[in-house]
Amino acid sequence: HIKYKAKQILTDKIDSELQRFNLSLNPFNPNSTIAKVNNNEDVEVDEWFTEVFNKAEEISQKSGGAFDITCAPLINLWGFGFSKMDSVTPQMIDSIKAFVGYQKVRLEGKKIIKEDPRILLNCSSIAKGYACDVIARLLEKEGVKNYMVEIGGEVTMKGVNQQGDCWRVGINKPEIGTSGVTNDVEEIVQLCQKGGVATSGDYRNFYIKDGKKYAHTINPATGYPAGQNILSATIVAEDCMTADAYATTFMVLGVEKAKLLAQSIPQIEYFIIYADNNGQQKVTYSKGMLEYLPNRKTLAILENP
């Protein structure tokens, strides 16, 4: 979904930009830069790959490795939707962890250097957000001042909508212990300046075994599904790539560690929906996030006149 106000229709330019993007960062396209890197082909990486790689490395360092684009082999081991849950052994995890870790891969000039040829990169937890930013840049280059770019639930926005109001996006209300997500809106996020909003939620994809919920987000440190208490994490940041990556990071860390990390990163605000020890749904959010929550902001003013 891309909404914008412009003198001419930009559909063709947007489509060709997305095709170029896929040729850089889509691991399922065998001709893409990332696929060639994963296949250990001799390839010079492009500017988009470089920007994503550098941002991923920065967030990996800040989060102590909770965010890690090298954990693709672990995701593959568990199988999509944990189809291989019962067959995964600690030995298998340890053997794969030998070639997982953001410190084991680096960018030198335009070349990716791997410590182990088995290292695979997967940027899915940052690339959708970056795609929003890429299209936003294109729109700005074309003189567009008001737009909203939404790709796979991640959003970059600037200016106002058709009615002249600030852009608004909804955060879905998760259902604990059911098939996942309702269409009910838990919260409205309103952005009146340029920025990115991303939500990561494991209620969409989890597996229950022996009474424990295993979330689809893998913890790179342990090699196991994160199993944290966060149902969904929404991040507001200056750009959507940053928001997207931190939303995933929060899912890995859990509520307390996520809040601690956020204190050291003033550029991001968060809204977390989590399950407490009794399985009750609760919310927590950063002080600065209140600015983007019109419904709660009004309540806060009424409660604290």
Can you describe what each PLM-predicted range is?
Residues H1-P305:
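Mature catalytic core of soluble alpha/beta enzymes
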